Amino acid sequence: MGRVRTKTVKKSSRQVIEKYYSRMTLDFHTNKKILEEVAIIPSKRLRNKIAGFSTHLMKRIQKGPVRGISLKLQEEERERRMDFVPDESAIKTDEIKVDKETLEMLASLGMSDTLGISAVDPQQAMAPIPAFGGGRAPRRY
C-alpha cells in the first residue's frame, strides 16, 4: 500500500512543474538535482518526496493533461481543439426520411415545404428485428 502525500508535497510539486517544466524529466535523480538548484527546501527527506511526486506527475503529463497543472503547451492544444470546425457535419440533413403520418403532422404545423423531407413506406423504413437467439431452433433440455 502506498504512502499518503501531504498537501505541501503536492502543491510544491505542481508549482515547480509549472515554472520549470522544460527542465524537468522523467528521471527522479535529475529532478532531485533540479529541485536543489531552483528551490529552497528545508530537509532532504522533503526534497526527495517532492522530486518523487514531480517525477510521477511528469509521467502523467506525458499521457495527457493533468488536473491542477496549467502548461502553455496544454493551453494551446486545448484552444486548438475548441476552435476546430469539421469540414463536413456529422449530422447530415440533405435528406430526411419520414413516414406518412409524420408528413401529415408537419403539414398541420405549416412545415410541409421544408427542404430535404421525403416520404418512405413504413415497412421499408423498419427492418425486421431478429428474434432473440438469432433465429435458430429452441434448446432441448
Swiss-Prot record:
One Pfam family in the UniProt entry: Ribosomal_S17e
Cellular component per GO, a single term: mitochondrion
Superkingdom of origin organism: Eukaryota
Keywords of this entry: Ribonucleoprotein, Ribosomal protein
Gene3D superfamilies: Ribosomal protein S17e-like
Protein name: Small ribosomal subunit protein eS17z
Signal peptide: none
Disulfide links within the chain: none
Molecular function terms from GO: mRNA binding; structural constituent of ribosome
GO terms of biological process kind: translation
Family, similarity comment: Belongs to the eukaryotic ribosomal protein eS17 family.
Coiled coil: none
Organism, scientific name: Arabidopsis thaliana (Mouse-ear cress)
InterPro entries membership: Ribosomal_eS17, Ribosomal_eS17_CS, Ribosomal_eS17_sf
